[in-house]
Regions:
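Bacterial N-terminal signal peptides that target proteins for export
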Residues: 2-12
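PDZ/PDZ-like domain segments forming the peptide/carboxylate-binding groove
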Residues: 68-69, 104, 109-120, 130-175, ...
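Acidic/histidine-rich, surface-exposed loop or edge segments in extracytoplasmic proteins
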Residues: 37-49, 87-91, 216-220, 386-389, ...
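Conserved functional hotspot residues or short segments at active or partner-binding sites
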Residues: 125, 140, 144, 156, ...
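Polar, glycine-rich mid-to-C-terminal structural blocks
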Residues: 484, 496, 501-566
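Cleft-lining beta-strand/loop regions that shape enzyme active-site pockets
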Residues: 24-29, 45-55, 59, 223-230, ...
Length: 706
């Protein structure tokens, strides 16, 4: 969760850093820049909620973190490399204090050296027949692996990795053939007029085709890797330091911060088109209706991008072979400025298109609602909230609380009986937004408590005296509901304002972060990136932290990820759980939660689909924990055959229909007639909602709330 500081708080936070930051001159090169970043990160970390001593023990944790990030599967560095690097194991604290790059440069130089060697090795592997009849195994669990002792072992490891990928590709082809045959047989059985031609390849043909595809994939992977600048890895190095403090304290490069801000605010200044990469070339992806690319009527999905002229006084930049994120940053820019694209159309013709950049909304960031018509004729409102977004730079920009309010008002006009607010997979967002959203459902009162590192506790209150919805309310959560989502679910529980349904507990992130932008205090135009720093913990108004434990559902429903290791409690260096005194609050709401729970448990115990879902989840988790797999073609295909036999019993899950009826709002219905992309997105959304067994139970539960 991100906290937006007031101007005063920002000044108080940064004053101790100013004297140090201002002493730097403009960097002459990347080494100077990285040195400055290291010093600033080190000083900023002292303001962490729970600062750690920068000593040898810290250095060892950083060391382990770094290699866990840079070579997690142990298929790049040799054991001799690791022995050489180990000399620095207890020196990384000193390097941070001095801004010394010796260890970073040594490891990254060696990484690029090994990648060059491995690239040549893989080319040699593909130049010879690949034998899939040998009785070998590939280790899937990285913790069971050792770094290769020498280059022969490195070669053998990559050969096994290639075999594993070829076998997977063969299985993918086989599964596609089987699906096509099944579809064809269904057409014949039902005497339909459709004709389905199934092209069947022999096993040898599949092997040859799979080998070529994996060869191309690996070759392209190395080409992309080599295009990355060595400084691009510096964020990984810095985060090895920061994440020892806690998992949510992270260094953001300027590019990473730009992407974060774009997603958080739900907007971007650009042309309104996705850029996609295929075989080293960049192509136009889907266009946003109403955005510059779409309005030009000169650009189509699938056009190949050859050049970009980012500014009128700049030359055209050839983007063939360029990384997607680099091309995207050429195309993006300031509002109302010109960008020129040179495109190759599908017919081979070359076209130059001039566009004026505009603010383009990323609609997937925003709340959306729909009316659900239940089998008994009652109507309920469903609001999907993907994030607690906010535009901190623009006071008139979109934010989650205003969007949710607008959706509630639209639903109220439909005379709905209750509201389901879905924050499954919502990872959080702005602290202010969750407080304001709670104010849509309750009168003036505390929503959440925050405590800083000194122990000072603040209570954040909703100031609204006029909630706009006082009817039945249900919150849907999952294992991925985190931070602000947990504040909302916790407050709804504490006030007994509504029911929380979903995964037995949420993610368990109970910390608050803010951004320190280093370049704001530097006498240079260079951008040094930002540090996202944990500065507070938050607590429910009952005094309990959500850290590690999350929020328990009133109506627990297990799902596909219930048995997986998902949540803050599985993260290294996560801050501990604790609690503080209860805030002074009262509630006029009352729910018979035990009755609702008993009724739900009876329904779920007799729901064959729900029980089958639990069996599927346990089986999938068992697969995920497999540590090795055979690389012999016959054994591999037999294993896949057995798995598919087991999967057959789960096919009912894909055919499930909750029998709920969904009605779009009239403005959205009208939009589907003009906007093909929006129509397809809406149809897909409704299709997925109809397959949602949790939503069906949510309707059952909210129907019983009196």
């Amino acid at each position: 969760m991100i906290q937006k500081f007031s101007k005063l708080n920002k000044i108080l936070l940064f004053v101790p850093l100013m004297s140090l930051m201002f002493c730097f001159n403009s960097p002459q090169n990347d080494n100077d820049k990285m040195h400055i970043i290291m010093i600033n990160v080190k000083n900023a970390l002292s303001f962490h909620y729970a600062p750690k001593p920068i000593n040898d023990a810290y250095s060892e944790e950083v060391y382990n973190n770094y290699f866990e990030s840079i070579d997690p599967t142990k298929k790049y560095f040799l054991q001799s490399d690791m022995d050489e690097f180990a000399k620095h194991r207890n020196l990384l604290d000193d390097y941070l204090n001095k801004g010394d790059l010796i260890f970073y440069k040594q490891t990254i130089d060696r990484l690029y050296e090994r990648v060059d060697e491995i690239d040549k090795m893989t080319q040699d592997i593909f130049s010879k027949p690949i034998n899939l009849d040998e009785n070998e195994e590939f280790i899937l669990e990285p913790k069971l692996k050792n770094h290769p002792a020498n280059k022969k072992e490195l070669y053998d490891e990559w050969k096994k990795y290639i075999k594993y990928n070829i076998l997977q590709e063969i299985e993918t082809m086989t599964s596609k053939e089987e699906a096509q045959k099944e579809k064809r047989d269904s057409v014949i059985a039902h005497r339909l007029k459709d004709t389905i031609n199934v092209k069947t390849l022999s096993l040898e043909e599949k092997k040859n085709k799979a080998t070529e595809e994996i060869k191309e994939l690996i070759s392209h992977t190395f080409k992309r890797f080599k295009k990355r600048k060595k400084m691009d890895w510096f964020s990984v190095y810095m985060n090895a330091y920061t994440e020892v403090f806690d998992p949510h304290t992270n260094y953001f490069s300027p590019k990473d911060k730009e992407d974060f801000d774009t997603n958080f605010a739900g907007k971007v200044i650009g042309i309104g088109a996705q850029i996609q990469e295929k075989k080293g070339h960049l192509y136009m992806g889907p266009l946003v209706v109403g955005a510059p690319a779409w309005k030009s009527k000169q650009i189509s999905e699938g056009d190949k991008i050859l050049k970009v002229k980012a500014k009128p006084n700049k030359e055209h930049t050839n983007v063939v072979g360029m990384l997607v994120d680099e091309a995207v940053r050429l195309i993006r820019g300031e509002k109302n400025t010109e960008v020129v694209l040179t495109l190759q159309k599908k017919d081979g013709s070359i076209k130059e298109v001039k566009l004026i950049r505009e603010e383009v909304s990323i609609e997937d960031t925003f709340a959306r609602s729909i009316v659900i018509n239940s089998p008994n004729g009652e109507k309920f409102g469903y609001i999907y909230l993907p994030s607690f977004n906010a535009d901190f730079e623009n006071p008139n920009g979109r934010n989650a609380s205003d969007d949710v309010k607008a959706e509630i008002l639209k639903l109220k006009a439909k005379n709905i009986k209750g509201i389901i607010l879905d924050v499954r997979s919502n990872g959080g967002g702005a602290l202010t937004e969750v407080v304001d959203i709670m104010g849509l459902f309750i009168k003036n009162g505390p929503v959440v408590q925050v405590k800083d590192g000194s122990g000072k506790i603040d209570i954040l209150r909703n100031r609204s005296n006029t909630p706009i919805w006082d009817g039945p309310l249900l919150i849907m959560q999952s294992e991925f509901s985190a931070s602000a989502s947990e504040i909302l679910a916790g407050a709804v529980k504490d006030y007994q304002r509504g029911v929380v349904l979903g995964s037995p507990h949420s993610y368990g992130k109970g910390t608050v972060q803010t951004f320190i932008e280093f370049n704001r205090f530097m006498r240079t135009s260079d951008d040094f990136g930002s540090l996202k720093l944990t500065i507070q913990k938050f607590y429910r108004i009952n005094g309990k932290s959500t850290q590690l434990k999350g929020v328990d559902a009133d109506i627990p429903m297990k799902g596909l990820f219930t048995y997986a290791e998902i949540g803050e409690k599985y993260k290294e260096n996560a801050l501990p759980w604790d609690q503080i005194p209860t805030a002074n609050f009262s509630s006029s709401y009352s729910l018979n939660l035990q009755k609702l729970l008993n009724n739900s448990q009876k329904r779920l115990a007799n729901d064959n689909i729900y029980q089958l879902l639990q069996e599927s989840a346990l089986w999938r988790e068992k697969l995920d924990k497999e540590e090795k797999i055979a690389l012999n073609l016959t054994k591999f295909m037999e294993l896949m055959k057995n798995r598919k036999e087991h999967i057959k019993k789960f096919k009912l899950l894909s055919k499930y229909d909750n029998q709920l009826k969904f009605t779009l709002h009239s403005d959205e219905e009208n939009r589907t007639k003009k906007d093909t992309a929006f129509k397809q997105k809406s149809e897909s959304w409704i299709k997925n909602l109809r397959k949602d067994i949790y939503l069906k139970e949510a309707i059952n539960v909210i129907s019983e709330i009196k």
